């Protein structure tokens, strides 16, 4: 029987529901970088990968609607962190795997996502996270939606760290270079204003 080498079908969740503290409380996904909102850069990358593009947003749904097939929001009003958006995405996802990306990593490219999907295809029952050096990136990951109940259990037990939960569930790492520029977070006004979007 031939080995299936087709890309892993995924729903995609773009996380844009945070408080934006480092941005002065602004809605980070709508801030402009290179002439477009951050969310537009991620949407353009993710759109070819799925027929189920979900955006987690807690503000301005009318501005996000054109970028998504579904919008979700947290079930708590106090910006409880990215795990709340992940929970909402897992509940809404139409495929058996959910690829998760934060809105502030516009340097992410298609080859990295292809590697992530291939690693997930080889580890169908486990969360797969990007890892660079000693650091895990739990918000750049693919998680089987069948793990939703385990994530819910951890949430109700008080855990709020996606990294801890995914590692407890047997998380696998996609190794990237320690200084991989594709993983740069544009999470301050200064980084948004630099030409490269990478700190000097």
Swiss-Prot record:
Pfam families: NTP_transf_3 (PF12804). GO terms for molecular function: GTP binding; metal ion binding; molybdenum cofactor guanylyltransferase activity. Transmembrane segments: none annotated. InterPro entries: MobA-like_NTP_Trfase, Molybde_CF_guanTrfase, Nucleotide-diphossugar_trans. GO terms for cellular component: cytoplasm. It catalyses: Mo-molybdopterin + GTP + H(+) = Mo-molybdopterin guanine dinucleotide + diphosphate. It is an enzyme of class 2 (transferase). Its EC number is 2.7.7.77. It is found in: Cytoplasm. Its cofactor is Mg(2+). It comes from the Bacteria. Keywords: Cytoplasm, GTP-binding, Magnesium, Metal-binding, Molybdenum cofactor biosynthesis, Nucleotide-binding, Transferase. The keyword Nuclease does not apply. GTP binds at residues 15-17, 28, 74, 104. The keyword Transmembrane does not apply. Monomer. Belongs to the MobA family. The N-terminal domain determines nucleotide recognition and specific binding, while the C-terminal domain determines the specific binding to the target protein. Transfers a GMP moiety from GTP to Mo-molybdopterin (Mo-MPT) cofactor (Moco or molybdenum cofactor) to form Mo-molybdopterin guanine dinucleotide (Mo-MGD) cofactor. This is Molybdenum cofactor guanylyltransferase. It comes from Pseudomonas fluorescens (strain SBW25). The lineage of its organism: Bacteria, Pseudomonadati, Pseudomonadota, Gammaproteobacteria, Pseudomonadales.
